[in-house]
């Protein structure tokens, strides 16, 4: 639809608004992680639009999609609004009459686009979800990610790193955020394209929440060897494989270059 409009309106400018989404799983909600997840989704979507030649900018919006839309309308004064949702049977936005409410409140024409991501196949670029904590900076994991990025015929590769927190308090979240920043910096030094967020203390919940937020080509889970890994004792790899609709890879790292716990 946007491609057709761009042919008609050469000066078409797009402002993309991504509302923050509350994860479905877990008893602990990290506000910064929710915003980080929305920011990564925004950057992915803008990259696709830019590759297609669109003049596009964006912002992370309120967790209420109606409020996020109205905030952007008030600031940007658009000529037209496009709202994309899942099919009616799967869309919470449609159950809350989002399209009709925005049209009535704004007085601006609203186009409704239905996107059935289950029918769209793999993501438009190669995206790996990486879940790790103590082994996130290990040589084994880094080399595996480099191999994926440089595989023969591989497209530009994005790695989304999730570092589960080690507890439910603010100090645990802050420590995980600091650890994540260090991991991302190390991977960028190796010329990898990365983004990341802190996850739920339960690694399975952290992984499932990330799969809710992102369409990925594969999941890469890094752990310590079986004799030292609580994640493996909890059967994390097989549990994720039962639910994920993409391949799940397991990287075992040595205990020599580790931080925190996995």
Positions of predicted regions on the chain:
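Small/aliphatic-rich secondary-structure junction motif
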Residues: 1-29, 115, 123-174, 251-253
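Glycine-rich, Arg-bearing micro-motifs that act as flexible, cationic patches
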Residues: 84-101, 223-239
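Short, flexible loop segments at boundaries between secondary-structure elements
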Residues: 107-121, 245-262
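Short, surface-exposed alpha-helical segments at coil->helix boundaries
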Residues: 32-43, 96-99, 173-181, 234-237
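A short acidic, amphipathic alpha-helical/loop segment
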Residues: 1-4, 71-72, 98, 143-144, ...
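Short helix-loop-beta junction
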Residues: 44-54, 182-192
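Structural beta-alpha unit
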Residues: 52-80, 191-218, 258, 262
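A structural signal for isolated positions on well-ordered beta-strands in alpha/beta enzyme cores
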Residues: 13-15, 57, 80-82, 111, ...
């Amino acid at each position: 639809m946007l491609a057709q409009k761009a042919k008609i309106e050469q000066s078409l400018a797009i402002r993309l608004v991504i509302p923050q989404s509350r994860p479905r799983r877990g008893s602990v909600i990290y506000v910064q992680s929710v915003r980080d997840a929305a920011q990564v989704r925004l950057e992915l979507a803008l990259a696709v639009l830019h590759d297609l030649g669109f003049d596009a900018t964006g912002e992370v919006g309120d967790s209420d999609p109606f409020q996020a839309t109205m905030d952007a309308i008030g600031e940007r004064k658009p000529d037209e609004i496009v709202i994309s949702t899942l099919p009616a049977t799967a869309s919470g936005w449609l159950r809350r009459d989002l399209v009709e409410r925005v049209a009535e409140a704004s007085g601006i024409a609203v186009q409704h686009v239905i996107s059935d991501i289950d029918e769209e196949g793999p993501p438009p670029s190669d995206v790996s979800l990486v879940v790790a904590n103590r082994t996130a900076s290990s040589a084994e994991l880094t080399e595996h990610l480099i191999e994926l990025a440089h595989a023969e015929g591989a497209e530009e590769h994005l790695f989304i790193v999730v570092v589960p927190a080690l507890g439910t308090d603010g100090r645990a979240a802050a420590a995980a955020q600091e650890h994540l920043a260090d991991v991302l910096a190390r991977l960028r030094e190796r010329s990898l394209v990365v983004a990341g967020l802190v996850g739920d203390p339960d690694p399975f919940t952290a992984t499932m929440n990330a799969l809710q937020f992102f369409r990925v080509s594969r999941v890469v889970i890094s752990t310590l060897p079986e004799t030292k890994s609580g994640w493996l004792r909890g059967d994390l790899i097989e549990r994720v494989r039962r639910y994920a609709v993409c391949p799940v890879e397991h990287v075992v790292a040595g205990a020599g270059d580790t931080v925190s716990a996995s």
